[in-house]
Amino acid sequence: FSRRHKLYREELNLTSPAAPLPLRPEASWLQFHLGISRDGLYPRSSPTVNRLLRDMQDFTTISADYSQDEKALLGACDCSQIVKPSGVHLKLVLRFQDFGKAMFKPMRQKREEETPEDFFYFVDFQRHNAEIAAFHLDRILDFRRVPPTVGRLINVTKEILEVTKNEILQSVFFVSPASNVCFFAKCPYMCKTEYAVCGNPHLLEGSLSAFLPSLNLAPRLSIPNPWIRSYSFDGKEEWEVNPLYCNTVREIYPYSNGNRLLNIVDMAIFDFLIGNMDRPHYEMFTKFGDDGFLLHLDNARGIKRTTLLRLQLLAEPEYRLSDVMRESLLQDRLAPVLTEPHLLALDRRLQLILKAVRKCIDTYGEAKVVANDTTQPEAPASARVKLTT
């Protein structure tokens, strides 16, 4: 299939479906990079983010390649350290005609499919719609720590196979017995065709997450999560068995002062709401120092008052989290992004969080549980119209 397709490309001179535009300072991805600050990846109500989302949906793809993770996996590594089968988490880097880049994660499971209860958190498939929903939830909570993410139907033949120069990526394309064009991750261990993703026959939906600035321009630190999960079937981490573990963390720099521990709590709340049970590390831009925000990518001592107030607002019938999320997600072309049971699950999880906070306040007092921060929270973006009417 690959050899025939290569000849077909050469015959038609299909090197690129469209000539790239010259690099423009006003390009949405560049303006997004320039707008990153100590407070978040983008300002509140940023028009740049909305423009970036539209561009990722509409612009022509001019190249496709494996991500750095997949490229690293193709090299030498200690196979005994790999827990999950290689090839399960397939993702590609797509470049658009304005030279912007996005991470493409294809659909692996249908929206209505639920993870079996017997699955371990480190063997589950990544869900493209979860990436989209996480961005919208992050924006509703006013964290602004998830890169802009949007859904798109990708023609895997024209927008990946015909524009990639990576021969390994070209070699993993095939036509299924149902005449659908499929491809899978190339890696040294368990790259079987049952992990393949397929178009219908060419179109495949997935999520596109905007790239952050390169590490050369904006260095980032990857820091182990103090509450990292165990990646074995029977082992436990210290925080799971030591009731005094949190007190120990609070005495260690940088969690002993500043906002770092409060940001960890924000991250834990976010992960609980989206059902993410696997956050082995978090990243921070080095430019903003120890009190910069935590990046919620592939997104103790107390809770910020602004976070608590926003969560309480989203528990009110007029601004119910599931309703705000439903309205926000309608903007995506792959809507409905979440099924109704998943939306209602957000309300249940929110109630569990507020119940836990109330229990802590009753036990220790509000002064020790709720930390005052300076910025007053705004109403969720999709609910502001209600506030002004």
State where each predicted segment sits.
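Phosphate/dinucleotide-binding and metal-coordinating scaffold of catalytic cores
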Residues: 1-389
